C-alpha cells in the first residue's frame, strides 16, 4: 500500500515491524494480513515476532506470510532460521494462516555476478528451482482473494525446473548476449572474497550460505504450487530474462 497510496479504497499507514504500538494502530480493523518478510538485518527475527504478536493483539484473523523453502531451526541458509521462527510464532498465535515458502529469486541472479560477469560461490553442482517475484506476487494475490480456501496450508513456490549456477550463467549469457560464467569457490575462498564489502559477520554468513544451501540440495525441489494456485505455469529464468531484456526490434 505504501508504494501505491493512490489506489481507490487504499489507505496508507506507516509502521515498522519492530514497533509494536505503531503496528497495533496500523492493523486495527484488519482481518486478513499479507506479511512480506522484512529486509535482511540482524534484528529481523525480533522484528517479525513483534509484528506477529501485534497482529494477534490487533485481532487479525488470517495471516499470509512469505517465508523460505526449507525454513528450519538449522537451515543451511542462515536467514531461513528467521523464517522458521516466524512461522512457529504464527502457528502458535491462533490466527488462521497460509505460508508461502519461496525459493531463491530468479530476478536476482544477474545481480549476483561481479563486474567481470562471474558468479562466485560454493554451490558446486547443486540445483536451485528459482522462482520469480512476479510469480510469488500472483500467488499471494490469488490466495488473498479467497483465504479460506488456503487456510492452514504451506506452499512451496518454485520455478518450473531446478538448474545449476553454471546453467544460470549460460542462460544469462544467452539473454544478455554477453559471456557470464560460474566459479565454484571453496567456503574459505567465499569468505575471503567477500571481505572487500566489510559487511557484518551475520550478513557474510547469509551470503555464503546462499550457495552452500544450493550445494547441499536444499533448493532443488520443484513444486507445481504456482501453477496449481494461479492456473499459469511458473516462469523460468530464461522466460524472466527474455521479458526483462526484450530482443531489440529491427
Task: Identify what each model region corresponds to.
Residues 188-250:
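A hydrophobic C-terminal alpha-helical subdomain
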Residues 5-19:
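Rossmann-fold cofactor-recognition segment
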Residues 1-3, 18-30, 38-49, 53-62, ...:
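Oxidoreductase cofactor-interface core, primarily capturing Rossmann-like NAD(P)-dependent enzymes
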Residues 67-68, 233:
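Catalytic nucleophile serine of serine hydrolases
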Residues 11-12, 123, 161, 219, ...:
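Compositionally biased, intrinsically disordered low-complexity regions
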Residues 1-8, 97, 245-248:
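Proteins with a high burden of low-complexity, intrinsically disordered sequence enriched in S/T/G/P/A and R
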Amino acid at each position: 500500500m505504501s508504494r501505491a497510496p493512490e489506489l481507490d479504497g487504499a489507505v496508507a499507514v506507516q509502521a515498522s515491524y519492530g514497533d509494536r504500538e505503531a503496528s497495533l494502530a496500523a492493523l486495527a480493523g484488519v482481518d486478513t494480513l499479507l506479511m512480506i518478510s522484512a529486509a535482511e538485518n540482524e534484528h529481523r527475527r525480533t522484528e517479525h515476532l513483534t509484528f506477529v504478536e501485534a497482529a494477534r493483539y490487533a485481532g487479525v484473523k488470517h495471516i499470509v506470510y512469505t517465508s523460505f523453502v526449507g525454513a528450519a531451526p538449522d537451515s543451511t541458509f542462515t536467514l531461513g532460521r528467521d523464517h522458521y521462527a516466524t512461522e512457529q510464532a504464527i502457528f502458535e498465535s491462533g490466527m488462521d494462516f497460509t505460508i508461502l515458502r519461496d525459493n531463491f529469486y530468479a530476478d536476482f541472479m544477474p545481480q549476483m555476478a561481479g563486474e567481470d560477469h562471474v558468479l562466485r560461490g560454493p554451490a558446486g553442482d547443486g540445483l536451485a528451482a528459482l522462482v520469480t517475484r512476479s510469480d510469488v506476487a500472483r500467488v499471494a494475490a490469488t490466495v488473498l482473494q479467497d483465504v479460506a480456501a488456503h487456510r492452514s496450508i504451506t506452499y512451496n513456490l518454485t520455478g518450473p525446473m531446478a538448474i545449476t549456477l553454471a546453467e544460470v550463467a549460460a542462460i544469462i549469457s544467452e539473454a544478455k548476449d554477453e559471456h557470464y560464467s560460474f566459479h565454484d569457490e571453496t567456503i574459505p575462498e567465499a569468505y575471503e572474497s567477500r571481505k572487500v564489502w566489510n559487511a557484518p559477520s551475520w550478513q557474510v554468513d547469509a551470503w555464503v550460505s546462499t550457495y552452500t544451501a544450493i550445494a547441499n540440495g536444499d533448493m532443488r525441489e520443484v513444486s507445481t504450487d504456482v501453477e496449481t494456485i494461479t492456473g499459469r505455469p511458473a516462469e523460468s529464468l530464461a522466460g524472466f530474462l527474455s521479458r526483462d531484456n526484450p530482443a531489440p526490434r529491427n
